[in-house]
Amino acid sequence: MSKQLQARRLEGIDHNPWVEFTRLSKEYDVVNLGQGFPDFSPPDFAVQAFQQATTGNFMLNQYTSAFGYPPLTKILASFFGKLLGQEMDPLKNVLVTVGAYGALFTAFQALVDEGDEVIIIEPAFNCYEPMTMMAGGRPVFVSLRLSPAPKGQLGSSNDWQLDPTELASKFTPRTKILVLNTPNNPLGKVFSKKELELVAALCQQHDVLCFSDEVYQWLVYDGHQHISIASLPGMWERTLTIGSAGKSFSATGWKVGWVMGPDNIMKHLRTVHQNSIFHCPTQAQAAVAQCFEREQQHFGQPSSYFLQLPQAMGLNRDHMIQSLQSVGLKPLIPQGSYFLIADISDFKSSMPDLPGAMDEPYDTRFAKWMIKNKGLSAIPVSTFYSQPHHKDFDHYIRFCFVKDKATLQAMDKRLCSWKGEPQA
């Protein structure tokens, strides 16, 4: 065909590191600690809810309401309304989407116009930038700044902080949206109330919307508390809060997400949704509705999955932190999420010439080397930064610790073999 096939809005966003690292992980015999999914079963009540949805009411095989299965939007409005301090209308304040990815894409398409600026806090999940660009917006990046831990001590995700002056400098008359992710992927940073108040004050001062990606909100450790920015004074009316059933109930394949916010904003998302996806799978929504109804009854009690999951994953996190240190990796202790990052600076000094393209960041070459030579997969943290900042943050790799005990034991065996081998 003589005409250009690719739409201009796709220029510069065609490369996806997840595709490459998924392919490598399948080509080699690896323990997959790169991709963020549990390799253990969802809780029994969730499995039973899904089974019931597929074998019970035959009408669950048909379309449901376009903006969400009514029992699901009702329980989401009730459950999160209490947490956010809002009387939420299931029909006006909640939209069910194909995963949190779908919620984000719908929000960007609905609200970002040509030339609008979108502030993205780095490191950031790497869909925010291409979604901004596909909508015609211009991403504006601000990096969390690291205050190194004292020598001999492990660092923490809390060591990464916003510089208030730098953040304020990113706001211009063209700024439309700030994207917030707490707990943060890949750092595992849980933004404090003080940090959220800084973001909230700037959003209100400059009349900017906030997209708050909170898919890991139940996975917080060591007594840290997740705070939804929409719960702060003056923020409900300018915030879209995004959640994920897959992350909440360890069932990422269900692909059920949601977005919540004020009706005057949500109505534009409904316009995009009804002209693209229109309906999400009914049976998965029915299962998620049952799961939340169960959690509402048990919320705050030891029987709540939202308490049990972080307790179990906190142990996994501690196990991985101890194990990774045995080969010279330096993990940073995460406050939340599925992930931790590890500093590979010592390897960069002792093994600087790993195979790979000259323009490839060191952490990308290291992650590929580790897959091929050590049988362990992780994700280079430079992929969570904009192109100009890749080389500044090329000495970290991200591991997922939300894994089965057998997977962690397999990791230990690979690390034990690695420990007994020469580095190169």
Swiss-Prot record:
Keywords for the protein's UniProt record, in alphabetical order: Aminotransferase, Cytoplasm, Lyase, Pyridoxal phosphate, Transferase
Positions bearing N6-succinyllysine: K82, K413
InterPro entries xref list: Aminotransferase_I/II_large, Kynurenine-oxoglutarate_AT, PyrdxlP-dep_Trfase, PyrdxlP-dep_Trfase_major, PyrdxlP-dep_Trfase_small
SUPFAM superfamilies with a match to the protein in the record: PLP-dependent transferases (SSF53383)
Keyword Amino-acid biosynthesis: no
Protein name: Kynurenine--oxoglutarate transaminase 1
Assembly description: Homodimer.
GO function term, MF aspect, one: kynurenine-oxoglutarate transaminase activity
Function: Catalyzes the irreversible transamination of the L-tryptophan metabolite L-kynurenine to form kynurenic acid (KA), an intermediate in the tryptophan catabolic pathway which is also a broad spectrum antagonist of the three ionotropic excitatory amino acid receptors among others. Metabolizes the cysteine conjugates of certain halogenated alkenes and alkanes to form reactive metabolites. Catalyzes the beta-elimination of S-conjugates and Se-conjugates of L-(seleno)cysteine, resulting in the cleavage of the C-S or C-Se bond.
Enzyme Commission number: 2.6.1.7, 4.4.1.13, 2.6.1.64
Involved pathway(s): Amino-acid degradation; L-kynurenine degradation; kynurenate from L-kynurenine: step 1/2
Family (UniProt): Belongs to the class-I pyridoxal-phosphate-dependent aminotransferase family.
Cofactor(s) essential for the protein: pyridoxal 5'-phosphate
Binding site for substrate: G36, N185, R398
